[in-house]
A protein has these predicted regions:
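Positively charged, polar, low-complexity stretches
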Residues: 1-96
Length: 96
């Protein structure tokens, strides 16, 4: 289910102080990057991903990451994407 504007605003506030946990390198979005993002989302639910110069532009890379991990793209600010995926069990974000 897509996030509402209010939920996105709250997640942006929570993600403001986070550091990027995954960095997309010059090879772009690969299966290894998607696996790393998937694991980070499972561990943290809300993560930042730094997107460096690569074969695709930052919008394409962020969308590919969101689709590849079934996550919601909360925000794309510059080269940093904020992704959210709620855990099925034991989630810190029950209202989402």
């Amino acid at each position: 289910m897509p996030l509402t504007g209010k939920q996105r605003r709250q997640l942006r506030g929570l993600g403001h102080h986070l550091e990027p946990v995954v960095i997309v390198g010059q090879s772009g979005v690969t299966e290894g990057v998607i696996a790393a993002v998937e694991q980070a989302l499972h561990d943290h639910e809300l993560i930042k991903v730094k997107i460096n110069e690569g074969p695709e532009d930052r919008h394409e890379a962020a969308e590919k990451l969101a689709q590849g991990t079934s996550a919601e793209l909360v925000q794309l600010l510059g080269r940093t994407a904020l992704l959210f995926k709620k855990r099925a069990e034991d989630s810190e974000f029950e209202d989402y």
